[in-house]
Amino acid sequence: MRYSQYFIPTVKETPSDAEVISHKLMLRAGMIRKLAAGIYNYLPFGLRSIRKVEAIVREEMNRAGAIELLMPAVQPAELWKESGRWEFYGKELLRFNDRKDAEFCMGPTHEEVITDLIRKEVRSYRQLPINLYQIQGKFRDEIRPRFGLMRGREFIMKDAYSFDVNEAGADVSYEKMYKAYRRIFERCGLKFRAVEADTGTIGGSYSHEFMVLADSGEDAIVSCSACEYAANMEKAETRKGEGIEHADPRPMEHVSTPGQKSIEDVATFLGVQNTQVVKTLVLVADGEPVVALIRGDYDLNEIKLKNHLGCAELEMAEDDVVVKVTGAPTGYAGPVGLAAKVKVVADLSLEGMHNFVTGANAADTHLKNVNIGRDFSVSGFVDIRNVVIGDACPRCDSGKLEIWRGIEVGHVFKLGTKYSKALKATFLDADGKEQIIFMGCYGIGVGRTVAACIEQNHDENGIIFPIPIAPFQCIISSLSAKEDEVKAASESIYQELLEAGIEVLLDDRDERPGFKFKDADLIGIPLRIVVGAKALAEGKVELKERRSGEVEVLPIAEAIAKVKAAVKEALQV
């Protein structure tokens, strides 16, 4: 491809609305352009990288035995109502009515559609197992789209769905997809971790997220220093409170704490550690108030609490609800003598804890020496907090938990019979008996994978693409392009690389060398051959590797050979 005939609208200035580096660089490198909030045009240069990821995904899906199909983006409401997700999914599901007033939605995912297809077409165990996948544009009405392709409303996704006769078969399908995902992200040149994850709105019994490691990542990743345990923050487990010394309960007493609302203020005012203060949090679960208790130095994990309660919606209570439940303003709530009968859930960290401080359910007042069982009751002790650095590993005896940042690029789910039971997707077994199909689903954010790659591969000059997903593998910077010898040599190298199957961009523009070099660094093509009159007089060209910055002046044939070898090595499967 000749640069002069291609469309790469690079810009020097960083757009003001871009926050993360991938968004900034994809805009500056002419890969994407914003159309509306969370909706982007994929320009030719960016689309080439997208297509590279798609090709790797297709190869690995096909290798794992999955079969490609394509489903509609528009889905009828009745399928979502049948599965129970029409209301559960919330406002992120874009809903609309057609001219006949029939209800539809733009699909953010396709569990209902694929299950409907299978229940109509699969009759016998002989037709199973089967794994179907698609690569398609989807829409999720994010409340706050941001970070470019990292959190858009319209996005390209690969989603696959497996169907098996039993749970053992579903486990085999899950493991195949898990291994395929590892190969996909390894081939894309990414540093990543597979972590245990919450199943969220998709549902099911078990899942893993594939997280690209990056300081800018939205998600926290938890891993053990001694074993293979890894999970995202929503899923990461804690142990029962450790280091709690037994103490005889002391008499509970009211203490005046004027203006002391925060945990830190109360602890300082009373001369205790914040570990001895218990937070009383009032939330609303499916319209009903609930109280969560957690140690003062920890944060509530709302996903864990939501899963424990089995509710569809969970949010922090408004001030008027707090007053109704506790009789006190926010900041002075406590579990003793609540004004309303509500469920009280205590975090594991409180089990065995004695003589702690809580709000007194009265303004400017707290209670000291509070004890569970004597002073109030709880429905149970449950893991409902976020882990912190240094927590004991839940899976081994020697490890401590570490926390990293990551970007989710893939997610695999063991669904079990969640959708097949709701939509009555069954088959006849070898004995002619009707059985429920076991399912799995597996997603990869294609555009997000490219963005995550850039988050992980860049420097102050621009993008540094790994060869497997680079829009082009080599760029030829033709200096003094009007000079016949330089032009002829550039053309000759270009043709030889093309014939060798190298994806090459010939920068034949009539621009200054510095301008061309800056563009080449910005767009991140891995290998660059510079053809200039001075080196060419000796039959040589300059070869530069984008990642290392290493520059060699080599005979033309040797430079071409090195490019071929580098590309061949990078693309080995």
UniProtKB/Swiss-Prot annotation:
One of its GO terms (molecular function) is ATP binding. This is Proline--tRNA ligase. SUPFAM superfamilies: Class II aaRS ABD-related, Class II aaRS and biotin synthetases, YbaK/ProRS associated domain. Consists of three domains: the N-terminal catalytic domain, the editing domain and the C-terminal anticodon-binding domain. GO terms for biological process: prolyl-tRNA aminoacylation. It comes from Citrifermentans bemidjiense (strain ATCC BAA-1014 / DSM 16622 / JCM 12645 / Bem) (Geobacter bemidjiensis). The keyword Cell membrane does not apply. Homodimer. Keywords: Aminoacyl-tRNA synthetase, ATP-binding, Cytoplasm, Ligase, Nucleotide-binding, Protein biosynthesis. It is an enzyme of class 6 (ligase). Gene3D superfamilies: Anticodon-binding domain, Bira Bifunctional Protein, Domain 2, YbaK/aminoacyl-tRNA synthetase-associated domain.
